[in-house]
């Protein structure tokens, strides 16, 4: 690929971190426009009709879904492969990623991180701790119960690190940043699996970047991303107003 790819979306999003991780593991160089989805201008809405991040732009295609992007990058850029080899295992990997993107994302991101962090900081509404506690009590256990049935006793689900492992693990940092008080000790296999995945240097680095970006002012972004060796896009698709997408909760 002759030019740097562009990733639109900030690393606080687990879906953006998933794509950044795939790029880093495969050695795909990229620049980033670290906007939040509610911040995108009209051009962003054209590229991402659902007004969601990430968006990937490279010399061949523009894509606006993290699952599609991850599979495209894996197919285009070869080794190391991040999907298992057999049809059955690949189907299982896609299912795990789908569960992560939808069910884990719904509970961890929309119902917890969004309610605890985005609603107060972006929409300037009060954090509803009673509603958050109810989700932790009534919805989170079912997610964790299922993950406990698929968590490997050691290593990763398919032996080598795969997108499926990354897709699950990226949500757990956002759960911690939401400060919900959720106690995950009842699911030791899942916690150990996530910890192993988060300890992979690429993931550890991206979590560090994301956590720091939570408290980094816009004027300080260039220095932060320069520190992590990630160039910023020359022009940003950030708009002046915050607006929700058609599927926003």
Q: Locations of the language-model features?
A:
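Acidic/histidine-enriched, glycine/proline-rich intrinsically disordered or flexible terminal extensions
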Residues: 210-249
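Generic N-terminal initiation segments characterized by hydrophobic and/or small/turn-forming residues
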Residues: 79, 137, 141-144, 211, ...
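Phosphate-coordinating loops and pocket residues in cytosolic domains that bind phosphorylated ligands
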Residues: 46, 199, 208
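GST-like fold's C-terminal all-alpha helical module
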Residues: 100-199, 205, 249
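Sequence-pattern detector for short linear motifs
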Residues: 20-21, 55, 196-199, 224
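Residue-level signature of transmembrane alpha-helix interfaces in integral membrane proteins
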Residues: 43, 117, 181, 216-218
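Acidic/polar loop patches that form or flank catalytic/metal-binding clefts of enzymes
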Residues: 82, 204-206
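GST-like domain detector, emphasizing the conserved glutathione-binding G-site
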Residues: 1-134, 234-249
């Amino acid at each position: 690929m002759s030019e740097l790819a562009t990733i639109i979306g900030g690393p606080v999003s687990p879906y953006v971190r998933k794509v950044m991780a795939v790029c880093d593991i495969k050695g795909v160089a990229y620049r980033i426009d670290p906007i939040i989805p509610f911040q995108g201008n009209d051009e962003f809405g054209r590229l991402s009709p659902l007004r969601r991040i990430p968006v990937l732009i490279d010399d061949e295609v523009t894509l606006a879904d993290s699952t599609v992007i991850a599979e495209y990058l894996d197919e285009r850029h070869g080794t190391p492969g991040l999907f298992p080899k057999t049809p059955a295992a690949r189907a299982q990997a896609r299912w795990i990623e789908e569960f992560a993107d939808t069910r884990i994302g719904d509970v961890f991101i929309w119902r917890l991180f969004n309610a605890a962090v985005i609603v107060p900081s972006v929409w300037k509404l009060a954090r509803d701790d009673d509603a958050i506690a109810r989700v932790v009590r009534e919805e989170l256990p079912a997610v964790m119960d299922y993950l406990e049935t698929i968590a490997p006793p050691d290593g990763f689900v398919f032996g080598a690190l795969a997108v499926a492992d990354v897709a699950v693990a990226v949500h757990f940092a956002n759960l911690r940043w939401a400060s919900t008080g959720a106690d995950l000790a009842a699911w030791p296999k899942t916690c150990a699996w996530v910890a192993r995945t988060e300890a992979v240097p690429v993931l550890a680095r991206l979590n560090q970047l994301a956590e720091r970006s939570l408290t980094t002012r816009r004027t300080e972004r260039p220095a932060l991303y320069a520190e992590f060796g990630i160039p910023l896009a020359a022009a940003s698709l950030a708009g002046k107003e915050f607006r929700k997408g058609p599927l926003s909760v």
